[in-house]
Amino acid sequence: NFHNTLSRYIKRLWPVITVQEWDPKVKSHTVLVGGVYYSDKDEDFEKCIELTFVYNPSIKKLKIGTRKFRTICGVIADTILHEIIHMRQYRRRGFKMLPEYASSASSSKVREEQIYLGCTDEIDAYGFNIACELLEKFRGNWKESIKFLNCDLKNTRIRGGCWKMYLKAFKHDHDHEIIKRLKKKVIRYLPRAEDGKPFKSRDWICH
């Protein structure tokens, strides 16, 4: 069983909870990966990072090639590191919540997305994810990675991962305060992304 085997391996490396879900909208022989950090569980010294794997219910046997499997593993690592950054954020400030970003978007859907992505915690966590994505995209070339951050990706089919997600949410406005803050965060995280971990210290997943 793919899910059980993968879950067992992940739990050997990280103290996380794994959840299996089914959705007919998921493409055949594909796995969607999501993650969440629970600050209340963390404060009570319980396992606080949850990974969710979503599969198509019509597929009895999952067929995944080497290339797709590597992609899935990359997404899992990015997701766990994203949530570990959130864990560190909450622990450092004594589990206090931060105020939400005040979006002025007229559309409720856009406003909801901007409130989520505009949060200081998300800018920090996605900053690391984007730094990793860019170094992978440009094979470790910092100059090309930074150059890409200043490109106009509107009306293009260029894959931009989380960076393009932010640009879309904030109307591809490179002068927007959130986009400018995120750019600085990404550049600051490049050396850490090169090491493959968001922090220098080794105790970033321990109390």
Where are these regions (language model features)?
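Zn2+-dependent metallopeptidase catalytic core
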Residues: N1-W14
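Post-HEXXH active-site segment of zinc metalloproteases
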Residues: G74, Y90-G118
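Long, well-structured alpha-helical subdomains associated
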Residues: K109-C119, I123, G127-H207
